[in-house]
Amino acid sequence: ILTAILPIAVSKCSERSFAKPTVSTSDTPEKPKDSGEILCALTAGLYKNSYSAETLKAIAILMNTNYRANPDSFKANDFLYEENASGSIKDVYGEIKKAAESAKNKTLRKNSEALFVPYSETSNGTTYKNENYKYIHSVASPWDCYQTDFDANAECVGVSLSGIDYLCKNGYSAEEALLWYLPDFEIADD
């Protein structure tokens, strides 16, 4: 059924173009944090009001994988700790904690190895292969064109967060949504 819908979705994607909003986060705190707080802060750093609880869980699995695979790839503004949260994020930080808690022992793995998985807010309807991430394949992501921040010129390698959100809101589990974008991976319990 999905393949029958793809041509319609792809043609719709080419009709619209929107600017991407930016997301800002706070600096890391001065005192060291445990791994649960770090995972929660990374998940919160990517939070959007529109994300479902299942989307937050998928993001937490992705962040857990990436932090374990390459902790040095993160910058201070990638983290949003609870004490630095404000506004709507402060109000839902409990939900973010719950998502991070449910994902703290889960990682995406290929051939039993946790590998860094790149991600973007959205794609142009397809994710791309990249020389730096030879273990990532191109997949269709036609539902990205329904996002308000859709950019027909966006080049996404790996996972589209908007695509993950769309799938999770339409019945996919966090794990199923991630595996749509990463068909050669598995989700392992550590």
Q: Which positions does each model-derived feature cover?
A:
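Conserved, single-site charged/polar hotspot
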Residues: 1-190
